[in-house]
Every structure is written in structure tokens, then in C-alpha cells.
Amino acid sequence: MAVKLRLTRMGNKKRAFYRIIAINSEARREGRPLDYIGYYNPMVDPAEVKIDTEKVQKWLERGAEPTDTVRALLKKNAQ
């Protein structure tokens, strides 16, 4: 089972925020996640990012592959 770290959309119409989740790569975007990693809210200025680094490290050690967007958020959060 290949696992991805990716975003799932939450919120209302035109007021979106995103949860960062670990999910089976074959599952649909709104499918049941294996774990919740954090969230990303682009609607506030500056954009709010909260990531549980321990969970991220755990999933990366298990071979999870982050999407390009999540990878950028991880880099931004590490600074």
C-alpha cells in the first residue's frame, strides 16, 4: 500500500482551508485518511500552516511520499 501525504479540502464555498493527511495513494481526495498531519489555511494573511513534525517524520520513515504542494509547505514550515 503506497501512502501519500496530501491536502484534503475543507470549509465552505470560497472559504477553503485544507487538512494535511496521510492517505492511501489510490484513495479519492475526500477518502478516509490514515492519519491527520496538520492544516493549511490560505485565507488569512499571512497563510497559517500547522504541521505535527513528529507525525510527518513517522510517515516519511514508513515510505510516504508527499505531494508537491505538501512538500513546499513542509519546507516553508521548517524555516
Curated annotation (Swiss-Prot):
GO molecular function terms noted in the UniProt entry: structural constituent of ribosome
SS bonds (residue pairs): none
Keyword Ribosomal protein: yes
Keywords, in A-Z order: Ribonucleoprotein, Ribosomal protein
GO cellular component terms listed in the entry, alphabetical order: cytoplasm; small ribosomal subunit
GO biological process assignments: translation
Gene3D superfamilies linked: 3.30.1320.10
Pfam families: Ribosomal_S16
InterPro entries cross-referenced by the UniProt entry: Ribosomal_bS16, Ribosomal_bS16_dom_sf
Similarity-based family: Belongs to the bacterial ribosomal protein bS16 family.
Protein name: Small ribosomal subunit protein bS16
Gene that specifies this protein: rpsP
